[in-house]
Regions:
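Alpha-helical interface subdomain recognition
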Residues: 1-92, 99, 112-117, 124-129, ...
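Flexible, glycine-rich active-site loops centered on histidine and acidic residues
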Residues: 106-112, 134-135, 186
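A short, Trp-centered hydrophobic/proline-enriched beta-strand micro-motif
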Residues: 128-136, 180
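Short Gly/Pro-enriched turn/cap motifs at secondary-structure boundaries
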Residues: 140-143, 167-170, 185-187, 213-222
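Hydrophobic, small-residue-rich alpha-helical packing segments that form membrane-like cores
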Residues: 141-148, 154, 159, 168-169
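Flexible, small-/acidic-enriched active-site or ligand-binding loops
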Residues: 147, 203-232
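A short core secondary-structure module
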Residues: 158, 162-208
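Long, acidic (Asp/Glu-rich), low-complexity accessory segments flanking structured domains
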Residues: 229-247
C-alpha cells in the first residue's frame, strides 16, 4: 500500500536547491526586469541566459517534457512540488523553461506536430529562443468552442483564415500563434474545428490592441485583441488532423489548469507569510495584532484553507500520474480550478486587511494578487462552468431511487436490519 506524504530524499535535495536559487537569484528579477517573454530585451537576456544555463546543468530545464525533448519527464506530483517554488516569481518559470503558454504549446507540438513543425517551432521554443501565443478565446464566444466564429476555408491548396480572437497571451512577443478555427461548420464543433500554426509575420495577422489586466497600461499589457484577416496557410500549418482541435485543446488545457493551481500555492504561501509577519510586528493598544482573537481566527482559517487546497492539488496530480488519462481526472482538475480563485482571494484579502492602508497601496503586492485571483477564476474557463463539470461527473456515480422514500430512510433501514438479524431479536419480537 503506497500512501504517504514524504518526498523522495534525492528529489528533496533538488527542491532545496530550487528554493534557494529562486529566492536568491530569480525573485529579485521581478523588480528590475520588465517582461520574461520579451526575447528582444538584450539586457534581460544577458541576465537570464546564465541562470538558465545553471538550471540546465542541474538537469531541471523543461521538467514537464520527456528526455527525447530535453527534459527529465517529471510526473505531475514532482511538477506540483516544483511549481510551488517557481510560482513565487514571474521570471522563475522562464528561468526553468516551463513558462505558460509556451509550456502548453510545446506539449501539443510534441504530441501532434510533424517533424518539420517540431524543427521550426518546437525546438527554438524548448531552447528558450522564442515565445509563442495560444489564440483560442473569442470576443463573443469566450472559451466556448461551440460559439466560435473564427474560420478557415479551403481555397485550392490553401486555407484562408478569418476571425477575431480575444485575450491572446503574449501576442506582442510571439514568433508564432496556435489558432483554433472552424473548418467544417456543418458538423459539431467538437469535430469541426482545427488547429493552425500561424507565423507572426504572415500577412493578415494583426494585433488590434494590447489589453491590460486591472491597472496595466496598453504598453505593459500581456494579452491582445487579435484579428486574422485573409491569412493564407497551407496544410503544413495544420497542427494535427483537420477536425481534431478540440481534442488537442483538452490535452493542453488539462495540464495548464493544474499547473496554474500549483503556482498559485506559491502565491498563497507568500500572502500567508506576509500576514503572519504583520500580525507579529504590528501592535495596537492591547499588544500585537497576533494576540487578537479575530486575527488568530483569520490566520487559522487561512492556514487550513491553504493546506486543504494544496492536498486537493496534490491528489489531482497523483491521479494524473496514476491514470495517465486526463479524462479520468476531469472532475478532479475542475474541482481544483473551482477552489483556486476562492482560496487565493480569501487569503490575500485577509493579508491585505491586516496591513491596513499600506495593504491597498502600490507599495504592497496585494491588489495585484487580488486581480490575479479573479484572473484565475476566468482563465481556461470560468468557475461556474467548472462547477457544472464537477457536478455532472460526480452525479454519474449515483442513480435515482425507485422508492417513494430515500434509500437512507431510517424506518426502511431499521426494518432491513431487523430482518437481517432477526434470529438475535426473536425474544423481543415475541414479546411485542
Amino acid at each position: 500500500m503506497a500512501w504517504d506524504f514524504e518526498t523522495d530524499p534525492d528529489f528533496q535535495t533538488e527542491l532545496d536547491w530550487m528554493d534557494e536559487f529562486v529566492r536568491d537569484e530569480v525573485e529579485p528579477l521581478d523588480f528590475v526586469l520588465d517582461d520574461p517573454y520579451d526575447k528582444s530585451d538584450e539586457r534581460a537576456m544577458e541576465i537570464l541566459r546564465p541562470l538558465q544555463a545553471q538550471v540546465k546543468a542541474r538537469g531541471l530545464w523543461a521538467c514537464h517534457l520527456g528526455p527525447e525533448l530535453g527534459g527529465p519527464g517529471y510526473g505531475q506530483v514532482k511538477l506540483a512540488l516544483m511549481n510551488q517554488i517557481l510560482g513565487r516569481s514571474g521570471f522563475a518559470p522562464t528561468v526553468f523553461g516551463c513558462q505558460a503558454p509556451d509550456s502548453g504549446n510545446a506539449e501539443i507540438l510534441a504530441h501532434f506536430g510533424t517533424q518539420p513543425q517540431k524543427d521550426r517551432y518546437l525546438q527554438p521554443l524548448l531552447d528558450g529562443e522564442i515565445s509563442s501565443c495560444y489564440s483560442m478565446t473569442e470576443p463573443h464566444g469566450g472559451a466556448d468552442p461551440t460559439l466560435f466564429t473564427t474560420n478557415a476555408v479551403k481555397d485550392g491548396d490553401e486555407w484562408v483564415l478569418n476571425g477575431e480572437k480575444w485575450f491572446s497571451s503574449n501576442a506582442r512577443y510571439a514568433s508564432f500563434f496556435i489558432v483554433m478555427a472552424v473548418t467544417n461548420p456543418e458538423i459539431s464543433a467538437y469535430e469541426g474545428m482545427s488547429m493552425f500554426i500561424v507565423p507572426a509575420e504572415t500577412p493578415g495577422v494583426n494585433i488590434i490592441r494590447n489589453v491590460g489586466i486591472g491597472t496595466e497600461s496598453e504598453e505593459d499589457a500581456s494579452h491582445a485583441y487579435m484579428r486574422y484577416e485573409n491569412v493564407r496557410l497551407t496544410d503544413d500549418n495544420l497542427l494535427g488532423e483537420p477536425g481534431s482541435a478540440f481534442g488537442i485543446a483538452q490535452v493542453r488545457l488539462g495540464g495548464g489548469r493544474i499547473h496554474h493551481a500549483m503556482r498559485t500555492i506559491a502565491q498563497l504561501e507568500k500572502a500567508f507569510d506576509m500576514m503572519c509577519e504583520r500580525a507579529l510586528s504590528r501592535s495596537t493598544r492591547n499588544g500585537p495584532l497576533a494576540s487578537l482573537g479575530v486575527v488568530q481566527e483569520q490566520i487559522a482559517d487561512s492556514w487550513i484553507e491553504i493546506e486543504q487546497f494544496k492536498l486537493l492539488v496534490m491528489r489531482a496530480a497523483w491521479k494524473i500520474d496514476k491514470y495517465n488519462d486526463y479524462r479520468r481526472v476531469r472532475h478532479d482538475i475542475a474541482a481544483v480550478k473551482v477552489a483556486m480563485p476562492k482560496v487565493y482571494h480569501d487569503v490575500v484579502l485577509r493579508a491585505m486587511h491586516l496591513h491596513g492602508a499600506l495593504g491597498v497601496s502600490n507599495e504592497m503586492p496585494f491588489t495585484r494578487m487580488l486581480i490575479g485571483a479573479e484572473v484565475m477564476a476566468l482563465a481556461d474557463g470560468p468557475t461556474e462552468v467548472h462547477k457544472t463539470t464537477v457536478a455532472r461527473q460526480v452525479l454519474r456515480q449515483y442513480k435515482a431511487t425507485d422508492d417513494l422514500f430515500p434509500s437512507r430512510h431510517l424506518p426502511k433501514l431499521k426494518a432491513a436490519a431487523r430482518d437481517k438479524y432477526a434470529a438475535y431479536f426473536e425474544h423481543e419480537l415475541a414479546a411485542i
